[in-house]
Swiss-Prot record:
Keywords: Pyrimidine biosynthesis, Transferase. It holds the Pfam family OTCace. It is an enzyme of class 2 (transferase). L-aspartate binds at K80, R162, R221. This is Aspartate carbamoyltransferase catalytic subunit. InterPro entries: Asp/Orn_carbamoyltranf_P-bd, Asp/Orn_carbamoylTrfase, Asp/Orn_carbamoylTrfase_sf, Asp_carbamoyltransf, Asp_carbamoyltransf_Asp/Orn-bd. It comes from Saccharolobus islandicus (strain M.14.25 / Kamchatka #1). Heterooligomer of catalytic and regulatory chains.
Amino acid sequence: MRLRHVVSSLDLTRDDYFRIFELADKFSNVKKLNYLSGKVVSLAFFEPSTRTAQSFHTAAIKLGADVIGFASEESTSIAKGENLADTIRMLNNYSNCIVMRHKFDGAALFASEISDIPIINAGDGKHEHPTQALIDLYTIYKVFGEIDGRTFGLLGDLKYARTVNSLLRALTRFKPKKIFLISPSQLKVRREILDGLNYPVIETENPYDVIQDIDVLYVTRIQKERFVDELEYEKVKESYVVDLKLVNMMKKDGIILHPLPRVTEIDRKVDKTTNAKYFYQASLAVPVRMALFYEVLGERKDD
């Protein structure tokens, strides 16, 4: 069954995740395919992006699609006063799929409700970033061969980081042993996210209390751009630094992930450890997004 919109991690079933992982395996080493020849992908990035935009662009090209779009709101008619709905309607005329990033929570869902073509959410405010969760889980699957039964530690800004929301929701499709949520009290996971989870969650402020139990340490930067109060940001901006002292307390086969960009939350000395998998994680973005494009736009014998 072809996917329609991918606005939230919850739009994917467990079977969807594994089917995308299988496709990503097949796409990992290909140079160019023509599966999406004749298709046009719009990259509608109303908010700045480097890795996400470029990896989506590369994924579309490697499948044979043409790519149009923009990299900032200032380069669109929105700067002249056009509303989001009209922009989405116009992009419907030019393309077969819209990959969208926006600063407002819920923007991708809004777009999906008026769009006749698939919307893929590339990040909307502090809400979700479902394709990053796909990459995160695929990395874990590649390293361990499974996702079920693992203990996770999510560390840093758990209030404003949309990658955290998507990962927590995606994990409801699996069977994690437990999740440690490690953050300052000001940056705890929001209640509406916690209420939808179906696995054990333990909140703490001290990573040293739980690091020895963790298989996957998922680190996020403090999201300065999401803070309304500059003083609040200053209080928490360097709450945690993952350094060699912390890493040396991890399980030998434990891994460290980060959606990037990194600022100061992971000491660069950690990069050379066997636990550091965040650059490997980033390298999987293109095959995962190729797999997603294929699921959304590829021809099906049963269509």
